[in-house]
Amino acid sequence: MKKLIFIIMVGSLFMGCFPITMQSLSQSSKVKAGMTTDEVRDIMGEPVMTELDRNVEEWHYCKFVVNKDRYLAIFFVDNKVIAKIFYTQAERMGDCSLFVKTGDYKVPPEVQAILDAPVDSIDTN
């Protein structure tokens, strides 16, 4: 029993040395199609990662959960939400922000259609 307590204490010390991202995903139901990036930021806070591919901007939020990290990806075109997805990742251990777009991540079909469109057919206003 003493050995188990010692192992737990030492493990806790090491876990305290690693940054862990704990974003709240509980407000995600408030994010709706057509919202602007500013409106989403007001609801969700700053994303852990953003990407821009052609005219699709993608924001990622994550929450470290033991054995299965939870993620939210929000997709914008012309500064407006067009899609959002939840996904999980359980294969790797560590801060969830390091494993964005892994696990069961899939680009939503409506976003993939935009990414697959010929470059000259994309409206860049």
List each model region and its residues.
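C-terminal motif of bacterial Sec signal peptides marking the signal peptidase cleavage site
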Residues: 14-16
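Residues within mature, well-folded domains
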Residues: 18-125
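Internal alpha-helical transmembrane segments of multi-pass membrane proteins, especially GPCRs
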Residues: 6-9
